[in-house]
Amino acid sequence: MNSIWKQYIDILQGVVKPALGCTEPICAAYAASVATQMLGSKPETIDVFVSDNLYKNSMGVFVPRTGRVGLAIAAATGAIGGNPDAGLEVLAKITEEEVDEAQKLIDNGCVVVQRETTDEFIYCRVIAKNAVHNAEVTISGGHTLIIEKRLDDNVIFTLDSSLPKTSTASICDGVDITISSIYDFATQAEFDDIKFILEAKELNIALAQEGLNNPYGLEVGRTYQKNIEKGLLAKSLDSDILIYTSAASDARMGGATLPAMSNYGSGNQGIAATIPVVKMADFFNADDEKLARAFIMSHLGAIYIKSHYPPLSAFCGNAVTSAAASMAMVYLAGGTFEQSCSAIQNTISDTSGMICDGAKSTCAMKVGSSAQSAMKSALLALNDHCVTKQGVIADDVEKTIKNIGRMITTGMPNIDHEIIEIMAS
């Protein structure tokens, strides 16, 4: 395997991984669990300091196994019963008794959450105290990327700046990567080297089934399924994509106790990169090798596009994740590389105005809408229709990606600020 392809695999394995619960509150749960481990006993007080974007994405989403929303319950349960060795699955084995104990801490005013001014989009600092010690853990740049630990105000760990970058914001820095090189890697790599990505199907389809079998959030997936059964809607590949992606997000945002295979720190974006591709593969009876190659396009393509702008912003990441999924769907349908590029152009043209106003139950509607856009855009591309030189869409897919990055990075910070202030008021 050439060295560049090895870098691609490292990227995928670095930011496509299982996550239980929305990753922003889970970040606080993880930091609190590590702080408690440092204390050696359960804390009496917990102070949580987070960036505005982490705050925004934690306000309205359920924390798994708690039946509650927000950073306070996430941090408290992480401290009381979280497993610091489990990363994004820190709350996988939380019990009802531990949730009750965590809630008592909150009810007694012992858990305080504050916004902190920082240039980092993903930032969480937790200070946990007992009668003897205080422990401080700082996460910055990635949901589990600890950059510093302090015990009794003494620094006991600082991240070595010479180590390879592992944050979502920097994951593609210095890597020779383009849509064309991703396509070549996906279609030419040895199957044994990429088959690990198939776990995404197992996890995210299981999450979709959970969302269809049980009432979570707005029940977007279940509602569409019921209306097909009533005859109001027709069953089709398009409806299957909408139902399964929405149902998975329903469960994800509703606090289901199943992990999602995340993408770039987001479970919903992992769903968007996975389920439409699975449904397209099922339609064409694609084998595991073909599906794995399509997953490389959707997951690595999404990571590459999103590396052009901050990991948390006023822009809904499902919009461009679905563009990469559309690329993969064209491949599964037997389309050309040029048609795959057209699918990306078409999807971004359709979804580029979708804002992020926090993680919550309505994400299921956005995930479903983005997935349907991926399908629509793939069909247009397969019929040689491509949006070009219109609005932010350039005459070349790489230029379009740069335009989107510019729009979000320089054009949307004020929008993000206003969204957060509206939500906090």
Curated annotation (Swiss-Prot):
Disulfide bonds, paired cysteine numbers: none
Family label: Belongs to the UPF0597 family.
Cross-referenced InterPro entries: Ser_deHydtase-like_asu (IPR005130), UPF0597 (IPR021144)
MF GO annotations: L-cysteine desulfhydrase activity
PANTHER family recorded: UPF0597 PROTEIN YHAM (PTHR30501:SF2)
Protein name: UPF0597 protein VF_0641
Species in which this protein is naturally found: Aliivibrio fischeri (strain ATCC 700601 / ES114)
UniProt GO BP: L-cysteine catabolic process to pyruvate
